[in-house]
Curated annotation (Swiss-Prot):
This is Gaegurin-4. One of its GO terms (cellular component) is extracellular region. The keyword Secreted applies. It comes from Glandirana rugosa. Expressed by the skin glands. Belongs to the frog skin active peptide (FSAP) family. Brevinin subfamily.
Amino acid sequence: MFTMKKSLLFLFFLGTISLSLCEEERSADEDDGGEMTEEEVKRGILDTLKQFAKGVGKDLVKGAAQGVLSTVSCKLAKTC
């Protein structure tokens, strides 16, 4: 019985220490939350450019596909 109490007390002690370390880390992260690093700014700019390029690419493909389809339908209907 004594060893069981000792083990439980030891586990409680370890849990308390790990919890306090996590809280310290969390508070340190919250302190830095207001500032953006250069890497975060670059990542944000690159993501924006990537999304823009995807949108332009889709528009180009869509326009090209419509052009090809209209040409093919014109040739099939022999109205060109």
